[in-house]
């Protein structure tokens, strides 16, 4: 992977890989991070780690050269969501997300909160349908649409509100690229190299399949974080993606 110029101290990578950090111990997380290269991936920090370790943990990762996807899935009244997104921008993260099911007014308020940050604003992404959810889960909530149809409806609302893209399953990516265009970014969890276990993600795909489907950023967790050689695993994934491009 190659580096491009950055106005910050952080490296910028053109790899589509985002490694999901899921650690209960800060030292263990940093020990893992120190084994990998910020030119090979970005990092995702979710609710558990951010609650445990706070903004300073994000700064520690940024000081090591990594761009951060702050995966907190804000879902609140418009004013509160807007302030939360602005706080994430102040922290200097690369990407932040909200729940599309929070509605148009909430998403619009979040987008408008980033206007003062200009080119330094993070990408603002909306979550459609969690990849662990199946049709039966949606039915329990009173949603009669299939996961794919419901995700597309929420993605259309997201684009209408002017956000940068959505989190979606890899299976939805092909249609979403056709419907919403190349500039609408698709972020996909549940990506696992061939031979990895499915874990708690129901709708999964390999990195090569995800790239072919139109995924812009692919989130990979345990296949990298639990690898005996995570640096080599990342390089192998990126090499396979370059061959597939």
Swiss-Prot record:
Family note: Belongs to the OMP decarboxylase family. Type 1 subfamily.
Gene3D superfamilies named among the record's database cross-references: Aldolase class I
Subunit text: Homodimer.
Database matches in SMART domains: OMPdecase
Keywords assigned: Decarboxylase, Lyase, Pyrimidine biosynthesis
Amino-acid positions noted as binding substrate in the UniProt annotation, renumbered to this chain: 22, 44, 71-80, 131, 192, 201, 221-222
Biochemical pathway: Pyrimidine metabolism; UMP biosynthesis via de novo pathway; UMP from orotate: step 2/2
Physiological role: Catalyzes the decarboxylation of orotidine 5'-monophosphate (OMP) to uridine 5'-monophosphate (UMP).
MF-aspect GO terms: orotidine-5'-phosphate decarboxylase activity
Catalytic activity annotation: orotidine 5'-phosphate + H(+) = UMP + CO2
Protein name (Swiss-Prot/TrEMBL): Orotidine 5'-phosphate decarboxylase
Lineage: Bacteria, Pseudomonadati, Pseudomonadota, Gammaproteobacteria, Enterobacterales
Leader sequence segment: none
Its EC number(s): 4.1.1.23
Gene Ontology process terms (BP): 'de novo' pyrimidine nucleobase biosynthetic process; 'de novo' UMP biosynthetic process
Catalytic residues of the enzyme: 73 (proton donor)
A GO CC term assigned to this protein in UniProt: cytosol
Coiled-coil intervals: none
């Amino acid at each position: 992977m190659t580096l491009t110029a950055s106005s910050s101290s952080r490296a910028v990578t053109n790899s589509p890989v985002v490694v999901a950090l899921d650690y209960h111990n800060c030292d263990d997380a940093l020990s893992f991070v120190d084994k990998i290269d910020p030119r090979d991936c970005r990092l995702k920090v979710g609710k558990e780690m951010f609650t445990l370790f706070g903004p300073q943990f994000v700064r520690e990762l940024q000081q090591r050269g990594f761009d951060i996807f702050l995966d907190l899935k804000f879902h609140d009244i418009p004013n509160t969501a807007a302030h939360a997104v602005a706080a994430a921008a102040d922290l200097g993260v690369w990407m932040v997300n909200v729940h599309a099911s929070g509605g148009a007014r909430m998403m619009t308020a979040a987008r408008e909160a980033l206007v003062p940050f200009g080119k330094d604003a993070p990408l603002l992404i909306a979550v459609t349908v969690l990849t662990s959810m199946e049709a039966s889960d949606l039915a329990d909530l009173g949603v009669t649409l299939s996961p794919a149809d419901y995700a597309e409806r929420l993605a259309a609302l997201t684009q209408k509100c002017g956000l940068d893209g959505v989190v979606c399953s890899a299976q939805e990516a092909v249609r979403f690229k056709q419907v919403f265009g190349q500039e609408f970014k698709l972020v996909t969890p549940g990506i696992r190299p061939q031979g990895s276990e499915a874990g708690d993600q129901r709708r999964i795909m390999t990195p090569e399949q995800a790239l072919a489907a139109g995924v812009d950023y692919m989130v990979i967790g345990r296949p990298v974080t639990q690898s005996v050689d995570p640096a080599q695993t990342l390089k192998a994934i990126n090499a396979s993606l370059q061959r597939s491009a």
